[in-house]
A protein has these predicted regions:
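ATP/NTP phosphate-donor binding region
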Residues: 1-63, 185
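Internal helical hairpin/lid segments
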Residues: 195-208
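Short amphipathic alpha-helical segments
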Residues: 18-20, 73-76, 100-102, 207-208
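Short Gly/Thr/Asp-enriched flexible loops that form oxyanion-binding sites at enzyme active sites
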Residues: 68-81
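Active-site glycine-centered loops adjacent to acidic/histidine catalytic or metal-binding residues
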Residues: 9, 66, 91
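Catalytic core of DAGKc-family lipid kinases
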Residues: 31, 40, 79-196
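Short, glycine/serine-rich, charged loops/turns that create anion-binding
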Residues: 11-12, 94, 200-201
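Hydrophobic packing residues within well-ordered alpha-helices of enzyme cores
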Residues: 24, 46, 72, 98-99, ...
Length: 208
C-alpha cells in the first residue's frame, strides 16, 4: 500500500470539492493508497507541509487552485532532488488553467480516477528569484489580479472575479524598463506587461 499526503485547500475557487471529497478519498483508498489528509490553514501552509512531511509519503496530491499547486511545488523544490516526490493535482480553483493544459478534468471525481491510473511524467518548472512556478510568472498590468482578488469574490464568481479586478487595474498602468537577452539578441525598452507561461490559457482565457 502506497502512502499519500492529500493536501486540501478548502477555500479554493468555488469550493466545489467539499461535495465530493469523500468520494475522491474513497477512490484513492480503493486503489491501494493509505491517505493522510491535511487541510491548509493559511496561504503558505501547503508549501510548509510539502517540505516538512515528504519523507513520510510516496506521493503528494493537492486539491485546490493553481496557487495551491504552486505552493506545493515550492515546498517540494526546497528539498534535495532525490527526496522530491511525485505530485498529483485535483483542480478545484477559479480557472484551473494549468490543469487544462495537462488535460486534467476539473471535476474532482473524474480527476481522481484519472490520477490513480496515471504514470508520473516530467513537467517544466520555472525559477524566478526565490520562487518556483509551473503555471505562469508575470509582471506589470494585470499580473497581481489573482492575488488582489478577494477570496470571497472568487468563491462566488469564479473567473468573473478576475475580470472585475482586472478592470480596476487599468486605472493605473506603470511601465518597467527592461533589457532582454534572447537568441543572441538584446532588446531594451519600457514594458507595461511581461509573462512567461507554461500553460495554454491564463486567467481563464484559452489559446494564449
Amino acid at each position: 500500500m502506497k502512502k499519500m499526503l492529500f493536501v486540501v485547500n478548502p477555500k479554493a475557487g468555488k469550493t466545489t470539492l467539499k461535495n465530493s471529497l469523500a468520494d475522491v478519498i474513497d477512490i484513492f483508498i480503493k486503489n491501494d493508497y493509505e491517505v493522510t489528509i491535511h487541510i491548509t490553514q493559511n496561504a503558505d501552509d501547503a508549501s510548509r507541509i510539502a517540505k516538512e512531511r515528504s519523507m513520510d509519503f510516496d506521493v503528494i496530491v493537492c486539491a485546490g487552485g493553481d496557487g495551491t499547486l504552486a505552493n506545493v511545488i515550492n515546498g517540494i523544490m526546497q528539498l534535495p532532488k532525490a527526496d522530491r516526490l511525485p505530485v498529483g493535482y485535483i483542480p478545484c480553483g477559479s480557472t484551473n488553467d494549468y490543469a487544462r493544459s495537462l488535460d486534467i478534468p476539473d471535476v474532482g471525481i473524474k480527476a481522481a480516477r484519472k490520477l490513480v491510473k496515471a504514470q508520473p511524467f516530467a513537467v517544466d518548472i520555472g525559477h524566478l528569484t526565490d520562487k518556483f512556478f509551473v503555471y505562469v510568472a508575470a509582471f506589470g498590468i494585470f499580473s497581481d489580479v489573482s492575488y488582489a482578488t478577494p477570496q470571497n469574490m472568487k468563491n462566488v464568481l469564479g473567473h468573473g472575479a478576475y475580470v472585475l479586478q482586472g478592470i480596476k487595474s487599468v486605472i493605473n498602468i506603470p511601465s518597467y524598463h527592461l533589457v532582454i537577452e534572447h537568441d543572441n539578441e538584446v532588446e531594451e525598452d519600457d514594458f507595461i506587461y511581461g509573462m512567461v507561461s507554461n500553460s495554454v490559457s491564463v486567467g481563464g482565457y484559452k489559446s494564449m
